[in-house]
Amino acid sequence: MKTYLVGGSVRDEILGLPVTDHDYVVVGVSPEEMVHLGFRPVGKDFPVFLHPQSQEQYALARTERKVSRGYKGFEVYASPEVTLQEDLARRDLTINAIAKDEYGNIIDPFGGIADLEAGVLRHIGPAFTEDPVRVLRTARFAARFGFHIAPETLALMNEMVHNGEVDALVSERVWQEIARGLMERHPSRMFYALRDCGALTRIMPEVDALFGVPQPPQHHPEIDTGVHVMMVIDYAASRNYSLQVRFAALTHDLGKGTTPPEEWPRHIGHEARSVRLVQGLCERINPPNEMRNLALLVARYHGDVHRAAELRPVTIANLLQGVDAYRKPERFEEFLQACACDFHGRPGYATRPYPQADRLREAFQAARSVDAGAIAKEMARNVSDPSRLPVAINTRVSETRIAEIRNRLGSLA
């Protein structure tokens, strides 16, 4: 029985990155022997065990054989006869097929260290094409490490797209990889990689459609809407914003991809079109509701936020009500963050001030200082017709909030 540290933990250690999870492969032992040694079996699709003390995962060396389409279409074979090299050969990229034994010796049969040093993402062999998730994973690693994809690997990814393998991915896996990619340091690199191999138009055609669509150069020096959106998500990443903010940043301008070319570079009404496209995208890839809800709000209202200095107090009050700021103040802050990312995601705008967000924060603080409960009690004493009471309360609360917003913003002028 021999135990090896494998995969991402070895890779990250070589790169000098923090190692949080340890994955082990065990060679020369049966499942029964693992149980006898005190390991607890937890694997559903292949033999994986938890160490009796550390609770870390130990997997028996295995091989895999493609038997049907999709990422689950594999037949797994695990036995004491499977070698370490055979186990490493089933992995996706050379940088993920490095092992270390208990004495610290490195086993690198596929040149992963050389590719780490060169900053290259390279597939191990033709079996790479058997798992469509590898298209997304490879693109995500490009975002994580800033590595470039080897031309021959990119060609295989393109082949997988054209063969329809990517179309077999279930929504849960697509969202899982997109979410992880958005949380990398440079998420745009994932989407550029997906576009390079043709996968973006299959997975997120709404985003792919943004590339090549011009915007007014006086507002968008980058001109290309797709490039703008990539700058927006990278800015969100540079600020360490949440996944909700990053997803909203990715989807806020989807409607510009449907603007008729004869109307370019203007995009009148793109906010409403963006809302419909965000709804369709979310129905397809099924992100959590908090992602969907924030993305819809940003798509609908980001133009209003950019014009905050021009908005009347009543319009600001309606905006606060529309984004449900009073009941969800934390989400309102994320809403403003996403709108700020849209502003900063342009050449030369990263360090410019964005007073619109602060203006709306001030307006919100003024509006939320209104005691709606006290107003309700007062109105209950003064309104004789109970059927008119709800409308009367809402009207008085709204009028008071508008007055507070007017006073607060007037004092800032």
Curated annotation (Swiss-Prot):
What the entry lists under CDD domains is as follows: HDc, NT_ClassII-CCAase
Where on this chain does CTP bind?
A: 8, 11, 91, 137, 140
Which GO molecular-function terms appear in the entry?
A: ATP binding; CCA tRNA nucleotidyltransferase activity; cyclic-nucleotide phosphodiesterase activity; magnesium ion binding; phosphatase activity; tRNA binding
Which UniProt keyword terms apply here?
ATP-binding, Hydrolase, Magnesium, Metal-binding, Multifunctional enzyme, Nickel, Nucleotide-binding, Nucleotidyltransferase, RNA repair, RNA-binding, Transferase, tRNA processing
Note the InterPro entries from the entry.
Answer: CCA_bact, HD/PDEase_dom, HD_domain, NT_sf, PolA_pol_head_dom, PolyA_RNA-bd, tRNA_CCA-adding_enzyme
Which residues hold ATP?
8, 11, 91, 137, 140
GO-annotated biological processes: RNA repair; tRNA 3'-terminal CCA addition
Q: What is its EC number?
A: 2.7.7.72, 3.1.3.-, 3.1.4.-
Q: For this protein, what does the record note about how its cofactor is bound?
A: Magnesium is required for nucleotidyltransferase activity.
Q: Which residues participate in Mg(2+) binding? A: 21, 23
Locate the HD domain: which residues? 225-326
SUPFAM superfamilies attached to this UniProt entry? Nucleotidyltransferase (SSF81301), Poly A polymerase C-terminal region-like (SSF81891)
Among PROSITE patterns, the record links this protein to: HD
Q: Which cofactor does it need?
A: Mg(2+); Ni(2+)
Quote the catalytic activity from the record.
a tRNA precursor + 2 CTP + ATP = a tRNA with a 3' CCA end + 3 diphosphate; a tRNA with a 3' CCA end + 2 CTP + ATP = a tRNA with a 3' CCACCA end + 3 diphosphate
Note the subunit structure. Answer: Monomer. Can also form homodimers and oligomers.
Record's function text: Catalyzes the addition and repair of the essential 3'-terminal CCA sequence in tRNAs without using a nucleic acid template. Adds these three nucleotides in the order of C, C, and A to the tRNA nucleotide-73, using CTP and ATP as substrates and producing inorganic pyrophosphate. tRNA 3'-terminal CCA addition is required both for tRNA processing and repair. Also involved in tRNA surveillance by mediating tandem CCA addition to generate a CCACCA at the 3' terminus of unstable tRNAs. While stable tRNAs receive only 3'-terminal CCA, unstable tRNAs are marked with CCACCA and rapidly degraded.
* Domain comment as written in the entry: Comprises two domains: an N-terminal domain containing the nucleotidyltransferase activity and a C-terminal HD domain associated with both phosphodiesterase and phosphatase activities.
What's the miscellaneous note? A single active site specifically recognizes both ATP and CTP and is responsible for their addition.
Q: Which family does it belong to?
A: Belongs to the tRNA nucleotidyltransferase/poly(A) polymerase family. Bacterial CCA-adding enzyme type 1 subfamily.
Protein name from the UniProt record = Multifunctional CCA protein
Task: Record the organism.
Answer: Nitrosospira multiformis (strain ATCC 25196 / NCIMB 11849 / C 71)
Gene this protein is translated from: cca
